[in-house]
């Protein structure tokens, strides 16, 4: 894929009022996307169905969402696209609505786990997946072309969806087995003052759980602030205080999950992915699981021991999904809590992932700690080393020798990951080993080889 001017790996994202997250750019982006979608519609029209393409726009709870929604709507309408406004719904809800309503595309206004000062815009294809690269490239090229407007008789219409949240709630519930319920289970659900504030608590309540909800009072400014999947310690405190069985933490757009048990222990994405896969193995063979460069070595070892393949993708759920599709595997995820179950949904979904974990626990009549007890997470040690200007760490002889020595010493007892920071001139030296002391000593050997 060629270098992009505006789009990153997850759409367009930045600070509100910056070069790309402003009303003027959103208007141009909406018009550009509309033109491309209209052209695709004409080229693939079969003579049946809608006269005009339709898209759905969903958003999280940031104050800037109103501005960006209105600008996108105007641009799309000017290009002759009908718009459905779903309001505040999780990112995976937009993927679901796009697919089930047979729409041309879905648009999400969210910066996920970032603070309210940021926002972003990303697209889903008609199949509820990421846009094909050629369509994304065409939209980006069209952004820099002059704004225009179709004739009055061809303008798109916009309307608010009254049932978007209800549709999504029912979809989430449909991924939980009909022969199970959550009766007698006491949950604390933290929606991060984000997109799931009005849907996630309903999902678990309607399946029978007693739910205490936190992070469900968005004011436009408090999304992800001290709550949600980025701050599970807040949830852990609430779970202990209320004597709950489990806690469920989502992030601002509800595609990320962390969980907490009744003791306050926090479970990250690696542990939750294992909980899901272990249950799926009782239904039939699981060919493999995709993690990332940051997935704990303990998960890789445990999956190998139970006969499940494992591959690492670059960090980012987009790359995890790409590798899952390439291999035909159904399960994957990140330590951060992006979990993908392609037998349930086309994209990562925190609420649905939590339901799959709960399915495992109900089937086994086990606690979360009991269910993942055979997964041994390896201690991790990371040292950040400043990179001197002009230093090519990939060809550094001292580092190469140190890495070879460390990897020989670890041999099946851990792993080494060396990568440059994407945001600052630093080299990240990470070692996972079967005990803390070995991880620390190994990471220090790598740092010493660079004179750190």
UniProtKB/Swiss-Prot annotation:
Binds 1 Mg(2+) ion per subunit. Keywords: Isomerase, Magnesium, Metal-binding, Phosphoprotein. It comes from Bordetella pertussis (strain Tohama I / ATCC BAA-589 / NCTC 13251). PANTHER family: PHOSPHOGLUCOMUTASE (ALPHA-D-GLUCOSE-1,6-BISPHOSPHATE-DEPENDENT), PHOSPHOHEXOSE MUTASE. Catalyzes the conversion of glucosamine-6-phosphate to glucosamine-1-phosphate. Transmembrane segments: none annotated. GO terms for biological process: carbohydrate metabolic process; peptidoglycan biosynthetic process; UDP-N-acetylglucosamine biosynthetic process. Activated by phosphorylation. This is Phosphoglucosamine mutase. The active site is at 112 (phosphoserine intermediate). InterPro entries: A-D-PHexomutase_a/b/a-I (IPR005844), A-D-PHexomutase_a/b/a-I/II/III (IPR016055), A-D-PHexomutase_a/b/a-II (IPR005845), A-D-PHexomutase_a/b/a-III (IPR005846), A-D-PHexomutase_C (IPR005843), A-D-PHexomutase_C_sf (IPR036900), A-D-PHexomutase_CS (IPR016066), Alpha-D-phosphohexomutase_SF (IPR005841).
């Amino acid at each position: 894929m060629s270098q992009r001017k505006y789009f990153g790996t997850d759409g367009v994202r930045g600070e509100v009022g910056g070069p790309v997250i402003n009303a003027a750019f959103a208007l141009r982006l909406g018009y550009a996307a509309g033109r491309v979608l209209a052209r695709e519609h004409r080229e693939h029209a079969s003579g049946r169905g809608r006269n005009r393409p339709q898209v759905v726009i969903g958003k999280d709870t940031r104050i800037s969402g109103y501005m960006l929604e209105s600008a996108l709507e105007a641009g799309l309408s000017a290009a002759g696209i009908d718009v459905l406004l779903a309001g505040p719904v999780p990112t995976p809800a937009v993927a679901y609505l796009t697919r089930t309503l047979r729409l041309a595309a879905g648009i999400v206004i969210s910066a996920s786990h970032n603070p309210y000062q940021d926002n972003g815009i990303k697209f889903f294809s008609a199949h509820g997946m990421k846009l094909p690269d050629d369509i994304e490239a065409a939209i980006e090229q069209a952004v820099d072309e002059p704004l225009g407007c179709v004739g009055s008789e061809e303008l798109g219409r916009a309307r608010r969806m009254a049932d978007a949240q209800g549709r999504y709630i029912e979809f989430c519930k449909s991924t939980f087995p009909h022969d199970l319920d959550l009766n007698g289970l006491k949950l604390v659900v933290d929606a991060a003052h984000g997109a799931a504030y009005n849907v996630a608590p309903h999902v678990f309540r309607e399946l029978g759980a007693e739910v205490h909800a936190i992070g469900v009072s968005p004011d436009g400014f408090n999304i992800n602030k001290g709550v949600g999947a980025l701050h599970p310690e807040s949830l852990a405190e609430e779970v202990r205080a209320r004597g709950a069985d489990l806690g469920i933490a989502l992030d601002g757009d509800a595609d990320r999950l962390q969980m907490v048990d009744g003791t306050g222990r926090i479970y990250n994405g690696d542990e939750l992915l294992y909980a899901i896969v272990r249950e799926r193995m009782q239904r039939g063979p699981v060919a493999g699981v995709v993690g990332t460069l940051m997935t704990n070595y303990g998960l890789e070892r445990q999956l190998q021991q139970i006969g499940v393949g494992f591959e690492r993708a670059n960090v980012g759920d987009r790359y995890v999904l790409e590798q899952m599709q390439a291999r035909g595997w159904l399960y994957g995820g990140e330590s951060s809590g992006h979990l993908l179950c392609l037998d349930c949904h086309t994209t990562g979904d925190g609420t649905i992932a939590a339901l799959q974990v709960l399915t495992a626990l109900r089937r086994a009549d086990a606690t979360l700690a009991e269910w993942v007890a055979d997964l041994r997470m390896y201690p991790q040690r990371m040292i950040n080393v400043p990179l001197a200007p002009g230093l090519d760490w990939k060809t550094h002889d001292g580092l190469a020798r140190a890495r070879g020595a460390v990897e020989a010493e670890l041999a099946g007892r851990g792993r080494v990951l060396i990568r440059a920071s994407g945001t600052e001139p630093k080299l990240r030296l990470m070692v996972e080993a079967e005990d803390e002391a070995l991880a620390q000593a190994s990471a220090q050997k790598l740092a010493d080889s660079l004179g750190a």
